[in-house]
Curated annotation (Swiss-Prot):
Cofactor comment: Magnesium is required for nucleotidyltransferase activity. Nickel for phosphatase activity.
Record's keyword annotation contains Transmembrane helix: no
Residues that hold Mg(2+) according to the record: D21, D23
Stretch forming the signal peptide: none
Pfam family, one: PolyA_pol
Function of the protein: Catalyzes the addition and repair of the essential 3'-terminal CCA sequence in tRNAs without using a nucleic acid template. Adds these three nucleotides in the order of C, C, and A to the tRNA nucleotide-73, using CTP and ATP as substrates and producing inorganic pyrophosphate. tRNA 3'-terminal CCA addition is required both for tRNA processing and repair. Also involved in tRNA surveillance by mediating tandem CCA addition to generate a CCACCA at the 3' terminus of unstable tRNAs. While stable tRNAs receive only 3'-terminal CCA, unstable tRNAs are marked with CCACCA and rapidly degraded.
NCBIfam families with a match to the protein in the record: PRK10885.1
Enzyme Commission number(s) of this protein: 2.7.7.72, 3.1.3.-, 3.1.4.-
Protein name in the entry: Multifunctional CCA protein
Family per record: Belongs to the tRNA nucleotidyltransferase/poly(A) polymerase family. Bacterial CCA-adding enzyme type 1 subfamily.
Species this chain originates from: Vibrio cholerae serotype O1 (strain ATCC 39315 / El Tor Inaba N16961)
Every HD domain range: 228-329
Miscellaneous note of the record: A single active site specifically recognizes both ATP and CTP and is responsible for their addition.
Length: 403
């Protein structure tokens, strides 16, 4: 039995990135031998075992053969005679197809080190096209490693385009699409996930709501970049620079989906996009099973970002109404999240990336002023029932007016 460290842990170690998970491949063993050695079986579709002490995953070396459509349509073969090289051959990218033995010796049969040095994401073998999930995985790695200068190899992009055209992407489950998108949000450049999917034609299949923003014009006076899709990528980039919150990053990416359904006769204006975007976000989140906390912030940003951009024009009553609609009294963290998205939206415009966003301060001050009005004082003054809320709002408006 020989045990090798494989995949992401080897890659990230060589890139001098933090290693969070370590996966191992076991060559020359069997399920019976693993159990006898004290390992715990956890794999459903193929033999994966947890180490008795570290609890790290150890998989028996295996080969795969395509048997049907989708990313689950594989027959798995594992036996003591499957070699390490055969196991590494089935992996997606050369930089993920390296292994290390217990002496620290690197095993790199497919040029992973070469591609790490060249900063290239390249498929291991033509079998890459058999697994549609790899399109999303490569897009995610492009987002994860873009800050280091990595790009997708032209021939790999061609295979991704082939998968996108084949109809195989439609067989991905909602959960897998969200899982890869969600992982991409934590990257240094989450916008590259969308960009790479767009470049290979996959965005139209997996996230058509975002894909249809490309080619839709906005008024050049406010949006020098004009194209709504390009604006969305720029906003995604700005959001990642402003916040580590995955909720904020997601909401920023989907806040303008309403612009994708504006009738061309109304272009380049999008008067109703804050309203029309709500149903699109709802159905997108339902379709790919986006968690409620992500959906709720996205809806709040979609509904209110235009109002917040006009903060200096709003009456105190309107500011208070916006704060109420954002539910900031019960969810105080919500205002900061929404304002970060709005600032990313404001800066996600060509040539305006460093533009200040005074609207943020205007709304924060309005919130603090309104927060300073205590409901206990209203009750102490003798107000009861519905009159408590009326008087509380009146006093909060006065506090905002006094700024």
């Amino acid at each position: 039995m020989q045990i090798y460290l494989v995949g992401g842990a080897v890659r990230d170690q060589l890139l001098q990135l933090p290693v969070y998970d370590r996966d191992w491949v076991v060559v020359g063993s069997s399920p019976q031998a693993m159990l006898a050695a004290g390992f715990q079986a956890v794999g459903k579709d193929f033999p994966v075992f947890l180490h008795p002490n570290s609890k790290e995953e150890h998989a028996l070396a295996r080969t795969e053969r395509k048997t049907s459509v989708g990313y689950t349509g594989f027959a798995c073969h594992y036996a003591p005679d499957v070699t390490l090289e055969e196991d590494l051959l089935r992996r997606d990218l050369t930089i993920n197809a390296m292994a290390q033995d217990n002496s620290g010796q690197l095993i790199d049969p497919y040029g992973g080190q070469r591609d790490l040095a060249a900063k290239v994401l390249r498929h291991v073998s033509p079998a890459f096209v058999e697994d549609p999930l790899r399109v999303l995985r490569v897009a995610r790695f492009a987002a994860k490693l873009h800050h280091l200068g990595f790009t997708v190899a032209e021939e790999t992009m061609q295979l991704m385009a082939k998968i996108a055209q084949s109809g195989e992407l439609q067989h991905l489950t909602a959960e897998r699409v969200w899982q890869e998108w969600h992982k991409s949000l934590s990257a240094h450049h989450p916008e590259m996930f969308l960009q790479v999917l767009r470049d290979c034609g996959a965005l139209a299949v997996v996230l058509p709501e975002i894909d249809r923003l490309f080619g839709v014009p906005q008024p050049e006076k406010w949006h020098p970049e004009i194209d709504t899709g390009i604006h969305t990528l720029m906003v995604a980039k700005q959001a990642a620079q402003l916040s580590d919150s995955l909720l904020v990053r997601f909401a920023a990416q989907v806040h303008d989906l309403g612009k994708g359904v504006t009738p061309p006769s109304e272009w380049p204006r999008h008067k109703l996009h804050c309203h029309t975007g709500l149903n699109i976000i709802e159905s997108l989140c339902e379709r790919i099973r986006v968690p409620n906390e992500f959906r709720d912030l996205a809806l709040a940003v979609c509904a209110q970002h235009s109002n917040i951009h006009r903060a200096d024009e709003l009456k105190p009553t309107t500011k208070l109404k916006v704060l109420g609609l954002l539910d900031v009294w019960r969810k105080p963290e919500r205002l900061e999240q929404v304002l970060l998205c709005c600032e990313a939206d404001h800066r996600g415009r060509l040539g305006l990336e460093s533009e200040p966003y005074p609207q943020r301060e205007i709304f924060l001050r309005a919130y603090q002023a309104a927060l300073g009005v205590a409901v206990q004082a209203v009750i102490a003054d003798g107000f009861q029932g519905k009159h408590i809320k009326e008087e509380l709002d009146k006093r909060r408006v006065s506090a905002i007016e006094a700024l």
